[in-house]
């Protein structure tokens, strides 16, 4: 997920994903696309363990699900959140993000949503994990 800020607006400008591919293959594909730049931190799924070390600039993301979702919803409500039309992974999942009858996040078809939340919320909290 590539995310950028202009002022207080957040722009999702690129997404990349694949199923059942290794971290090495993912990194190679993203490197070929020019995604790794020394000036960017790469926030990774904290459950990734040692695989995070395989990602250039990889650090554990803030995985505070509810706080991260609430932050992104607030951006959307204020008109401060934009997604590039080429981000088909994000656009394909964003409307599926939902809660069940107990107000718990439904964990299905959400890989891009998790990546987006990691990128946006980890950056604004400087990687601080909120409990």
Language model features by range: what are they?
Residues 7-107, 126-127, 131:
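Mg2+-dependent endonuclease catalytic cores in nucleic-acid-processing enzymes, primarily RNase H-like
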